[in-house]
Amino acid sequence: MIKLLVLWLLILTIFLKSPTVEGDVSFRLSGATTTSYGVFIKNLREALPYERKVYNIPLLRSSISGSGRYTLLHLTNYADETISVAVDVTNVYIMGYLAGDVSYFFNEASATEAAKFVFKDAKKKVTLPYSGNYERLQTAAGKIRENIPLGLPALDSAITTLYYYTASSAASALLVLIQSTAESARYKFIEQQIGKRVDKTFLPSLATISLENNWSALSKQIQIASTNNGQFESPVVLIDGNNQRVSITNASARVVTSNIALLLNRNNIAAIGEDISMTLIGFEHGLYGI
Protein backbone atom coordinates (compact mmCIF):
# COMPACT_ATOMS: atom_id res chain seq x y z
CA MET A 1 0.00 0.00 0.00
CA ILE A 2 2.81 2.40 0.92
CA LYS A 3 4.64 1.54 -2.30
CA LEU A 4 1.52 2.29 -4.33
CA LEU A 5 1.08 5.61 -2.53
CA VAL A 6 4.70 6.59 -3.25
CA LEU A 7 4.29 5.62 -6.90
CA TRP A 8 1.08 7.65 -7.15
CA LEU A 9 2.75 10.71 -5.61
CA LEU A 10 5.68 10.38 -8.04
CA ILE A 11 3.34 10.25 -11.03
CA LEU A 12 1.35 13.21 -9.70
CA THR A 13 4.55 15.23 -9.27
CA ILE A 14 5.60 14.55 -12.85
CA PHE A 15 2.30 15.72 -14.26
CA LEU A 16 1.84 18.75 -12.03
CA LYS A 17 5.34 20.20 -12.09
CA SER A 18 5.97 23.46 -13.91
CA PRO A 19 6.34 23.05 -17.68
CA THR A 20 9.88 23.20 -19.01
CA VAL A 21 11.41 24.04 -22.35
CA GLU A 22 11.96 20.85 -24.31
CA GLY A 23 13.61 19.77 -27.54
CA ASP A 24 17.10 21.03 -26.70
CA VAL A 25 19.74 20.87 -29.44
CA SER A 26 23.51 20.84 -28.90
CA PHE A 27 26.63 21.58 -30.97
CA ARG A 28 30.29 21.41 -30.00
CA LEU A 29 32.98 23.23 -31.97
CA SER A 30 35.73 20.88 -30.80
CA GLY A 31 36.10 18.23 -33.48
CA ALA A 32 33.30 19.79 -35.55
CA THR A 33 33.07 18.86 -39.23
CA THR A 34 30.88 19.87 -42.13
CA THR A 35 28.83 16.76 -41.40
CA SER A 36 28.40 17.42 -37.67
CA TYR A 37 27.35 21.01 -38.36
CA GLY A 38 24.82 19.71 -40.88
CA VAL A 39 23.45 17.30 -38.27
CA PHE A 40 23.15 20.18 -35.80
CA ILE A 41 21.14 22.29 -38.26
CA LYS A 42 19.00 19.26 -39.14
CA ASN A 43 18.28 18.71 -35.45
CA LEU A 44 17.40 22.38 -35.03
CA ARG A 45 14.92 22.20 -37.90
CA GLU A 46 13.38 19.07 -36.44
CA ALA A 47 12.98 20.80 -33.06
CA LEU A 48 10.63 23.33 -34.68
CA PRO A 49 7.02 22.08 -34.76
CA TYR A 50 5.23 22.74 -38.02
CA GLU A 51 1.62 23.00 -39.08
CA ARG A 52 1.95 21.25 -42.44
CA LYS A 53 4.19 21.24 -45.49
CA VAL A 54 3.82 23.61 -48.43
CA TYR A 55 5.69 22.45 -51.52
CA ASN A 56 7.34 19.96 -49.16
CA ILE A 57 8.67 22.81 -46.97
CA PRO A 58 7.67 22.81 -43.27
CA LEU A 59 5.31 25.68 -42.45
CA LEU A 60 6.00 26.79 -38.90
CA ARG A 61 3.06 27.00 -36.52
CA SER A 62 1.44 30.39 -36.13
CA SER A 63 1.17 30.29 -32.35
CA ILE A 64 2.28 28.18 -29.40
CA SER A 65 1.64 29.12 -25.79
CA GLY A 66 3.81 28.83 -22.73
CA SER A 67 7.16 27.09 -22.53
CA GLY A 68 6.44 25.06 -25.65
CA ARG A 69 7.10 28.18 -27.71
CA TYR A 70 10.83 27.95 -27.04
CA THR A 71 13.66 25.53 -27.61
CA LEU A 72 17.24 25.76 -26.39
CA LEU A 73 20.50 25.48 -28.30
CA HIS A 74 23.55 24.52 -26.27
CA LEU A 75 26.66 25.76 -28.08
CA THR A 76 30.16 24.89 -26.85
CA ASN A 77 33.33 26.58 -28.08
CA TYR A 78 36.80 25.09 -28.52
CA ALA A 79 37.62 25.96 -24.88
CA ASP A 80 34.66 23.85 -23.66
CA GLU A 81 32.65 26.91 -22.60
CA THR A 82 28.90 26.64 -23.25
CA ILE A 83 26.14 29.15 -23.82
CA SER A 84 22.47 28.20 -24.06
CA VAL A 85 20.41 30.09 -26.62
CA ALA A 86 16.62 30.49 -26.43
CA VAL A 87 14.83 30.27 -29.79
CA ASP A 88 11.18 31.04 -30.54
CA VAL A 89 10.03 27.98 -32.51
CA THR A 90 7.34 29.91 -34.43
CA ASN A 91 9.84 32.13 -36.25
CA VAL A 92 13.37 30.90 -35.34
CA TYR A 93 14.06 34.25 -33.68
CA ILE A 94 16.68 34.26 -30.94
CA MET A 95 15.29 35.71 -27.71
CA GLY A 96 18.40 35.65 -25.55
CA TYR A 97 21.04 33.39 -24.06
CA LEU A 98 22.47 32.07 -20.81
CA ALA A 99 26.18 32.11 -19.90
CA GLY A 100 26.99 30.63 -16.51
CA ASP A 101 24.36 31.98 -14.12
CA VAL A 102 23.64 35.18 -16.07
CA SER A 103 20.90 35.49 -18.69
CA TYR A 104 20.90 38.08 -21.48
CA PHE A 105 17.74 39.06 -23.36
CA PHE A 106 17.10 41.38 -26.27
CA ASN A 107 15.31 44.63 -25.46
CA GLU A 108 11.95 43.79 -27.01
CA ALA A 109 8.51 42.60 -25.93
CA SER A 110 8.87 39.07 -27.31
CA ALA A 111 12.11 38.53 -25.38
CA THR A 112 10.52 39.87 -22.19
CA GLU A 113 7.78 37.28 -22.64
CA ALA A 114 10.34 34.54 -23.28
CA ALA A 115 12.10 35.40 -20.01
CA LYS A 116 9.01 34.14 -18.17
CA PHE A 117 9.76 30.61 -19.39
CA VAL A 118 13.50 30.26 -20.06
CA PHE A 119 16.58 30.70 -17.86
CA LYS A 120 14.40 31.29 -14.81
CA ASP A 121 17.11 29.95 -12.50
CA ALA A 122 19.67 32.55 -13.60
CA LYS A 123 21.00 34.58 -10.69
CA LYS A 124 21.16 37.73 -12.79
CA LYS A 125 19.22 38.95 -15.82
CA VAL A 126 20.68 41.50 -18.24
CA THR A 127 18.60 43.33 -20.84
CA LEU A 128 20.75 44.07 -23.86
CA PRO A 129 20.74 47.69 -25.12
CA TYR A 130 19.16 46.74 -28.45
CA SER A 131 16.51 44.53 -30.00
CA GLY A 132 17.28 41.47 -32.09
CA ASN A 133 16.62 42.78 -35.59
CA TYR A 134 19.43 43.27 -38.06
CA GLU A 135 19.16 47.03 -38.33
CA ARG A 136 19.56 47.53 -34.57
CA LEU A 137 22.35 44.98 -34.25
CA GLN A 138 24.32 46.39 -37.17
CA THR A 139 24.01 49.89 -35.72
CA ALA A 140 25.29 48.63 -32.37
CA ALA A 141 28.10 46.70 -34.05
CA GLY A 142 29.09 49.66 -36.21
CA LYS A 143 29.25 47.47 -39.29
CA ILE A 144 26.99 45.66 -41.72
CA ARG A 145 26.78 41.89 -42.09
CA GLU A 146 28.88 41.76 -45.25
CA ASN A 147 31.84 42.95 -43.17
CA ILE A 148 31.44 40.42 -40.35
CA PRO A 149 33.14 37.03 -40.97
CA LEU A 150 31.20 33.78 -40.73
CA GLY A 151 32.36 30.16 -40.53
CA LEU A 152 32.91 27.79 -37.62
CA PRO A 153 35.96 29.69 -36.27
CA ALA A 154 33.79 32.84 -36.27
CA LEU A 155 31.08 30.98 -34.36
CA ASP A 156 33.67 29.90 -31.79
CA SER A 157 34.75 33.51 -31.31
CA ALA A 158 31.12 34.61 -31.03
CA ILE A 159 30.42 32.05 -28.32
CA THR A 160 33.50 33.20 -26.39
CA THR A 161 32.49 36.86 -26.67
CA LEU A 162 28.98 36.12 -25.44
CA TYR A 163 30.17 33.78 -22.69
CA TYR A 164 32.28 36.54 -21.16
CA TYR A 165 29.95 39.27 -22.46
CA THR A 166 32.31 41.73 -24.04
CA ALA A 167 29.90 44.65 -24.50
CA SER A 168 31.88 46.31 -27.29
CA SER A 169 31.72 43.25 -29.53
CA ALA A 170 28.54 41.51 -28.35
CA ALA A 171 26.38 42.86 -31.19
CA SER A 172 28.78 41.51 -33.84
CA ALA A 173 28.88 38.17 -32.01
CA LEU A 174 25.08 38.02 -31.97
CA LEU A 175 24.99 38.67 -35.72
CA VAL A 176 27.32 35.70 -36.21
CA LEU A 177 25.22 33.59 -33.85
CA ILE A 178 21.93 34.39 -35.61
CA GLN A 179 23.29 33.61 -39.06
CA SER A 180 25.05 30.43 -37.90
CA THR A 181 21.87 29.03 -36.35
CA ALA A 182 18.55 30.58 -37.37
CA GLU A 183 19.50 31.60 -40.92
CA SER A 184 21.21 28.27 -41.57
CA ALA A 185 18.03 26.53 -40.45
CA ARG A 186 15.96 28.69 -42.81
CA TYR A 187 18.17 28.21 -45.88
CA LYS A 188 20.20 25.23 -47.07
CA PHE A 189 22.49 27.58 -49.01
CA ILE A 190 23.52 29.44 -45.86
CA GLU A 191 23.96 26.15 -44.00
CA GLN A 192 26.29 24.92 -46.74
CA GLN A 193 28.28 28.15 -46.91
CA ILE A 194 28.99 28.13 -43.18
CA GLY A 195 29.36 24.37 -42.79
CA LYS A 196 32.10 24.01 -45.37
CA ARG A 197 34.25 26.61 -43.58
CA VAL A 198 35.38 24.33 -40.75
CA ASP A 199 38.77 25.93 -40.21
CA LYS A 200 38.49 29.32 -41.89
CA THR A 201 36.20 32.32 -42.10
CA PHE A 202 34.56 34.12 -45.00
CA LEU A 203 32.52 37.24 -45.61
CA PRO A 204 28.87 36.58 -46.53
CA SER A 205 27.90 37.36 -50.10
CA LEU A 206 25.17 39.74 -51.17
CA ALA A 207 23.24 36.63 -52.22
CA THR A 208 23.31 35.44 -48.61
CA ILE A 209 22.24 38.82 -47.28
CA SER A 210 19.34 39.07 -49.72
CA LEU A 211 18.06 35.65 -48.66
CA GLU A 212 18.17 36.70 -45.02
CA ASN A 213 16.31 39.92 -45.78
CA ASN A 214 13.56 38.18 -47.72
CA TRP A 215 12.58 35.16 -45.65
CA SER A 216 9.23 36.70 -44.70
CA ALA A 217 8.49 37.77 -48.28
CA LEU A 218 9.40 34.37 -49.73
CA SER A 219 7.42 32.56 -47.04
CA LYS A 220 4.34 34.64 -47.79
CA GLN A 221 4.51 34.24 -51.56
CA ILE A 222 5.14 30.50 -51.39
CA GLN A 223 2.01 30.10 -49.27
CA ILE A 224 0.06 32.23 -51.75
CA ALA A 225 1.39 30.17 -54.66
CA SER A 226 0.05 26.97 -53.11
CA THR A 227 -3.50 28.19 -53.86
CA ASN A 228 -2.64 30.24 -56.95
CA ASN A 229 -1.45 27.65 -59.45
CA GLY A 230 2.12 28.00 -58.27
CA GLN A 231 2.32 31.71 -59.06
CA PHE A 232 3.44 34.44 -56.69
CA GLU A 233 1.08 37.35 -56.16
CA SER A 234 4.08 39.71 -56.06
CA PRO A 235 7.65 38.98 -57.21
CA VAL A 236 10.43 38.68 -54.65
CA VAL A 237 13.69 40.27 -55.78
CA LEU A 238 16.86 38.50 -54.68
CA ILE A 239 20.56 38.92 -55.47
CA ASP A 240 22.20 35.97 -57.25
CA GLY A 241 25.76 34.66 -57.08
CA ASN A 242 26.81 37.16 -59.74
CA ASN A 243 25.47 40.09 -57.70
CA GLN A 244 22.61 40.53 -60.15
CA ARG A 245 18.99 41.14 -59.23
CA VAL A 246 16.69 38.22 -60.00
CA SER A 247 12.92 38.28 -59.75
CA ILE A 248 11.31 35.19 -58.22
CA THR A 249 7.74 34.83 -59.47
CA ASN A 250 6.67 31.23 -58.92
CA ALA A 251 7.13 28.10 -56.83
CA SER A 252 9.27 26.35 -59.44
CA ALA A 253 12.24 28.64 -58.76
CA ARG A 254 15.29 26.90 -57.31
CA VAL A 255 15.19 28.98 -54.14
CA VAL A 256 11.82 27.30 -53.47
CA THR A 257 12.60 23.79 -54.68
CA SER A 258 16.09 23.33 -53.25
CA ASN A 259 17.03 26.14 -50.85
CA ILE A 260 14.46 27.50 -48.40
CA ALA A 261 13.96 24.93 -45.64
CA LEU A 262 11.39 26.58 -43.35
CA LEU A 263 8.41 28.86 -43.94
CA LEU A 264 7.24 31.60 -41.60
CA ASN A 265 3.49 31.28 -41.13
CA ARG A 266 1.77 34.10 -43.00
CA ASN A 267 -0.37 34.77 -39.93
CA ASN A 268 2.80 36.04 -38.26
CA ILE A 269 4.25 38.02 -41.13
CA ALA A 270 2.22 41.20 -40.61
CA ALA A 271 3.16 41.29 -36.92
CA ILE A 272 6.84 40.61 -37.44
CA GLY A 273 7.43 42.47 -40.69
CA GLU A 274 10.63 42.27 -42.69
CA ASP A 275 13.84 43.43 -41.03
CA ILE A 276 15.10 46.56 -42.79
CA SER A 277 18.86 46.24 -42.71
CA MET A 278 21.53 48.70 -43.75
CA THR A 279 22.31 46.31 -46.57
CA LEU A 280 18.78 46.37 -47.94
CA ILE A 281 18.84 50.16 -47.89
CA GLY A 282 22.10 49.91 -49.80
CA PHE A 283 20.43 47.76 -52.45
CA GLU A 284 17.62 50.25 -52.90
CA HIS A 285 19.97 53.17 -53.36
CA GLY A 286 22.51 51.37 -55.51
CA LEU A 287 25.31 51.71 -52.96
CA TYR A 288 26.75 48.34 -53.93
CA GLY A 289 26.99 48.94 -57.65
CA ILE A 290 24.27 46.43 -58.43
From Swiss-Prot:
<dbReference type="InterPro" id="IPR016139">
    <property type="entry name" value="Ribosome_inactivat_prot_sub2"/>
</dbReference>
<dbReference type="InterPro" id="IPR017989">
    <property type="entry name" value="Ribosome_inactivat_1/2"/>
</dbReference>
<keyword id="KW-0800">Toxin</keyword>
<keyword id="KW-0325">Glycoprotein</keyword>
<comment type="similarity">
    <text>Belongs to the ribosome-inactivating protein family. Type 1 RIP subfamily.</text>
</comment>
<dbReference type="InterPro" id="IPR017988">
    <property type="entry name" value="Ribosome_inactivat_prot_CS"/>
</dbReference>
<feature type="active site">
    <location>
        <position position="212"/>
    </location>
</feature>
<feature type="propeptide" description="Removed in mature form">
    <location>
        <begin position="271"/>
        <end position="290"/>
    </location>
</feature>
<dbReference type="GO" id="GO:0090729">
    <property type="term" value="F:toxin activity"/>
</dbReference>
<feature type="glycosylation site" description="N-linked (GlcNAc...) asparagine">
    <location>
        <position position="250"/>
    </location>
</feature>
<keyword id="KW-0378">Hydrolase</keyword>
<feature type="signal peptide">
    <location>
        <begin position="1"/>
        <end position="23"/>
    </location>
</feature>
<protein>
    <recommendedName>
        <fullName>Ribosome-inactivating protein bryodin I</fullName>
        <ecNumber>3.2.2.22</ecNumber>
    </recommendedName>
</protein>
<dbReference type="InterPro" id="IPR016138">
    <property type="entry name" value="Ribosome_inactivat_prot_sub1"/>
</dbReference>
<feature type="glycosylation site" description="N-linked (GlcNAc...) asparagine">
    <location>
        <position position="214"/>
    </location>
</feature>
<dbReference type="GO" id="GO:0006952">
    <property type="term" value="P:defense response"/>
</dbReference>
<dbReference type="GO" id="GO:0030598">
    <property type="term" value="F:rRNA N-glycosylase activity"/>
</dbReference>
<comment type="function">
    <text>Ribosome-inactivating protein of type 1, inhibits protein synthesis in animal cells.</text>
</comment>
<dbReference type="InterPro" id="IPR036041">
    <property type="entry name" value="Ribosome-inact_prot_sf"/>
</dbReference>
<dbReference type="Pfam" id="PF00161">
    <property type="entry name" value="RIP"/>
</dbReference>
<dbReference type="InterPro" id="IPR001574">
    <property type="entry name" value="Ribosome_inactivat_prot"/>
</dbReference>
<dbReference type="GO" id="GO:0017148">
    <property type="term" value="P:negative regulation of translation"/>
</dbReference>
<keyword id="KW-0652">Protein synthesis inhibitor</keyword>
<keyword id="KW-0611">Plant defense</keyword>
<keyword id="KW-0732">Signal</keyword>
<feature type="active site">
    <location>
        <position position="183"/>
    </location>
</feature>
